[in-house]
Amino acid sequence: MTLGGLTITAQAIELANKMSDQFVQGAGDGLLGLAFGQINTVTPTPVATPVENMISQDSIPASAELFTAKLGSWRDANEPDKGESFYTFGFIDDATVTASGQEVKYAPVDNSQGFWMFDSTSATVNGTSVAQSGNTAIADTGTTLALVSDDTCKAIYDAIPGSTYDQANQGYTFPSNTTADQLPVVTFAVGDTQFAVQKEDLGFADAGNGMVYGGIQSRGSMTFDILGDTFLKGIYAVSPLAHVDDGLANIV
């Protein structure tokens, strides 16, 4: 398997027996998992993940056993990179960090469940804190939305004029003519640092009848938040394997 300029030998690839209509209609033709190997479901013998193989095959240096993710956005369509996304394996893109005007901030990660899980004990909406004692979250590029507690969802959409819970779409919506200055500043804690969701990512898709389906929705019965692409589009994520930290720098 080849990823950019890296070749991974003897990489196991699972074949799907059934695919959703949404997946079939998408532009991609596969899913690259970047979680930890302990959630591997291959039977009878688990296999190494792509990143584990990169490390064991010395495709990335021992001094930089990490990967990074920068998810592009439509807001950058007029930029030189056209808003394209990228991953790096084995190095941090210093130009992206420099452009953010910030240093990478690291938070301890609990990988006991196989996820990039960290403490996320608060959120803010227009500067007002929403306490989430004992709360944890995972960063997941494979999840489109940000999925958070009901209390946090309510605080966010209470701050957007005309927002409502749409029973038909099973989620919060708000008027499509909502201007940027009417949208709240929303941040989520990653360890001790708050990171903002870009306002243009608060809306996900057209919900009809002049409404937009929100990019942040309820996590339902899950006991942790999933900070997916809605959140990740606003940051540059650095994920070291060796010391199990998760590093984030705001993108501006």
Predicted regions and their residues:
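Conserved beta-strand elements of beta-rich interaction domains across eukaryotes
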Residues: 20, 37-39, 92-94, 143-144, ...
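Short hydrophobic beta-strand that contains or immediately precedes a catalytic carboxylate
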Residues: 31-32, 137-141, 147, 226-227, ...
